[in-house]
């Protein structure tokens, strides 16, 4: 009789442990999935009217990146920016300005993708006229001085040059600018 009672007690005790383990496992899974849903829905941080500067080794300005609104999503390794402005400097003088409606910062700033009504303006110098580039998407690799696009582009250079094409690559290190496809050039001879 005693062995039956102890065997029953052991089985009952094992059953209670199994039920509580199952219950706790389900609670942990449910809590983990609800935390995961909270993480994916909200940004890790949020900034308004921000400005970020990067300098060269000698301390001179390389570029300033600013915008109206920045949201960073850790789970996607991406930062979204509204109305970004990218100012490039040469010898501490503003060389070019790029504006758009949206941008994605990828890999902690190694790549910036400007989207929606992108306008690049290269300011005039003593040897060059003002140049404007229009596209729907522009990829900037600020650490490599490399800019590219796979979208249709339009370049307008003073006084009367207009270039259209699809896709472009600008590599400052190699000092090359290539339009990839469907290039058309319109040139109007200046009036004297």
Predicted segment positions?
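Mature-chain termini and adjacent capping regions
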Residues: 1-192
């Amino acid at each position: 009789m005693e062995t039956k009672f102890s065997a029953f007690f052991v089985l009952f005790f094992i059953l209670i442990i199994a039920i509580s383990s199952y219950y706790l496992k389900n609670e942990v899974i449910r809590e983990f999935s609800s935390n995961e849903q909270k993480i994916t829905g909200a940004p890790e941080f949020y900034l308004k009217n921000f400005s970020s500067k990067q300098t060269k080794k000698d301390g001179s300005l390389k570029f300033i990146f600013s915008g109206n609104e920045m949201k960073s999503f850790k789970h996607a390794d991406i930062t979204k920016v509204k109305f970004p402005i990218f100012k490039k400097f040469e010898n501490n003088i503003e060389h070019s300005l790029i504006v758009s409606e949206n941008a994605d910062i990828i890999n902690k700033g190694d790549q910036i993708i400007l989207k929606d009504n992108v306008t690049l303006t290269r300011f005039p110098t003593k040897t060059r006229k003002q140049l404007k580039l229009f596209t729907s998407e522009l990829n900037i690799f600020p650490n490599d001085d490399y800019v590219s696009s796979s979208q249709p582009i339009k370049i307008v250079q003073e006084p009367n040059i207009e270039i259209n094409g699809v896709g472009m690559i600008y590599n400052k290190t190699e000092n090359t600018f290539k339009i990839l496809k469907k290039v058309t050039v319109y040139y109007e001879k200046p009036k004297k």
